[in-house]
Swiss-Prot record:
Family: Belongs to the frataxin family.
Protein name as annotated: Iron-sulfur cluster assembly protein CyaY
Keyword Iron: yes
SUPFAM superfamilies: Frataxin/Nqo15-like (SSF55387)
One Gene Ontology molecular-function label: ferric iron binding
InterPro entries per record: CyaY, Frataxin/CyaY, Frataxin/CyaY_sf, Frataxin_CS
Any single GO CC term annotated in Swiss-Prot or TrEMBL for this entry: cytosol
PANTHER family: FRATAXIN, FRATAXIN, MITOCHONDRIAL
Biological function: Involved in iron-sulfur (Fe-S) cluster assembly. May act as a regulator of Fe-S biogenesis.
Keyword annotations from UniProtKB, A to Z: Iron, Metal-binding
Organism: Salmonella heidelberg (strain SL476)
Superkingdom in the source lineage: Bacteria
Gene name for this UniProt entry: cyaY
An example Gene Ontology biological process: iron-sulfur cluster assembly
Amino acid sequence: MNDSEFHRLADALWLTIEERLDNWDGDSDIDCEINGGVLTISFENGSKIIINRQEPLHQVWLATKQGGYHFDLKGDEWICDRSGETFWDLLEQAATQQAGEKVSFR
């Protein structure tokens, strides 16, 4: 994967997250902000999830209250380099915990 393809894929990931949160109809107030290569999800309780790009490594990094995760693209899925879990699974787990209700991105 070259840098241009990495940015295209990361942009698509950011757009999907933003669209899902724009359509969020849960009770919790969840906001999403993109600034440069960083996407910040903010919750009512003041907690945040930070997602950023690591261009030199062609990785997406996810920072949550539960910890930090690094994802490599394998096939068409972003996979955690430690646990083997998908980006979407870990993001949903963290967002659900931080929102206090089920949050789905798929």
